From Swiss-Prot:
It comes from Bacillus pumilus (strain SAFR-032). Pfam families: Ribosomal_L32p. SUPFAM superfamilies: Zn-binding ribosomal proteins. GO terms for biological process: translation. One of its GO terms (cellular component) is large ribosomal subunit. This is Large ribosomal subunit protein bL32. The keyword Lipid metabolism does not apply.
């Protein structure tokens, strides 16, 4: 099995890991109730999506 010829430096290791981070979700205000929600998702407070009532009891 192959082994690394040289030890990976702290800088190279950290530069490689710069992309391993959490993404911030795109938050927008709901046009119906004004509550903050994730874009392209159903609003949790009023249950609407694209102007239609999706969450009905």
């Amino acid at each position: 099995m192959a082994v690394p010829f040289r030890r990976t430096s702290k800088m190279k290791k950290r530069l490689r890991r710069t992309h391993f981070k959490l993404q911030v979700p795109g938050m927008v205000a709901c046009p119906e109730c004004g509550e903050m929600k994730i874009s392209h998702r159903v609003c949790k407070s009023c249950g609407t999506y694209k102007g239609k009532d999706v969450k009905s009891n």
